Swiss-Prot record:
Database matches in Pfam families: UPF0147
InterPro entries found in the cross-reference section: Ta0600-like_sf, UPF0147
Family: Belongs to the UPF0147 family.
The name this protein goes by in its record: UPF0147 protein MM_1385
Domain of life: Archaea
Length: 93
């Protein structure tokens, strides 16, 4: 089993935040989805919570967003990729 160091997990979070930022600045994305993305960014930036808990909370919101019928296809793909990246963060950190 491959172990990720906390630096790897921090890098995953940093990359996810960059993608989330690009989604919030995309005017083709509906406002309710951009609000949810901002909420995810706040969760991921909240360092008072454990990293795995921030990732799990974010994945839950991403799953809700991905089911929105108004979500543009290119954004849906980004959201699936974000979810996959966040799932690589181990629970035991």
């Amino acid at each position: 089993m491959i172990q990720m160091s906390s630096n790897d997990s921090s890098e995953v979070i940093r990359q996810c935040l960059q993608v989330l930022e690009s989604i919030t600045s995309d005017s083709s994305v509906p406002r309710n989805i951009r609000r949810s993305v901002n909420e995810i960014m706040d969760i991921l930036n909240n360092e008072s919570e454990p990293l795995f808990l921030r990732a799990a909370s974010s994945i839950s919101i991403l799953e809700d967003i991905s089911n929105d019928p108004n979500l543009p296809l290119h954004t849906r793909t980004l959201i699936w990729n974000l979810s996959s990246q966040l799932e690589t963060i181990p629970v035991d950190e």
